[in-house]
Amino acid sequence: MRRVLFTCSIVILLAASVSAQKTKPWTEWTAKDADKILNDSAWGQTQSEGDSSSRPDSTSAITQTTAARESSVKNAGAAANVESGEKKAGVALYYRVRLLSAKPIRAAFVRLIEIQGAPPEKVAQWRAFVDRDFGDYIVVTITLDGSTDRKRMGMVMAEIGNVDAEALKATTYLERKDGKRVALMEYRAPTDVLGAKFVFPRTLDGKPFIAADSGELRFSTEAGKVLKISKRFKVSEMMYEGKLEY
């Protein structure tokens, strides 16, 4: 009985945390709030490879190197120079899959930079990135962190950086619960801390690809022998500021 009550309490606390992130302004998010949006939410998911028992929690996951912090502060003119932070080393390799075209993801990036000490005037410049209109596109990003196996990390990064963009179109797509898909339009290899970018059309047959009743959105990609990602996002949880964000 105690175990059941404890489990129920955890579920309630998690639900309350998610609700708080959606109701309070992003400018008031804590580091943990922003980290959860980036890595464990309707817009950001984590796929692990290896021993996930050493996976960093929300608190340790937002730590970053001094060099990374200084780099992000210096490059205020580029929206891409925003990061969620380097994670503490672990055995597992973590693929962070995020819907960059969703406002909460962009807001979380900028909020973390603000919390980490960027000058107010720089943060003000970055806020334009939060409100950016992605128009007719859905953009998914992938970043990697967490592994002490530098060889493995290097192999994966090389695969992501050198993948044939045209060949990738045959193995990369977004899929709804009903099985309908949109294929990859464009691939951009990682050139900044936002990671590799996968660009998809926002419409299918003249209608928005995602609607409130779509159930779920699945991102799938496969490249070479080392990269295979498949993550699902719950559409019912994508409402933010009265709008379906994806």
Segments and roles (model prediction):
Residues 1-5:
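Positively charged n-region of N-terminal signal peptides that target proteins for export
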Residues 6-7, 73:
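General helical structural elements
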Residues 7-16:
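Bacterial N-terminal signal peptides
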Residues 21-246:
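PEST-like low-complexity, intrinsically disordered acidic/proline/serine-rich tracts
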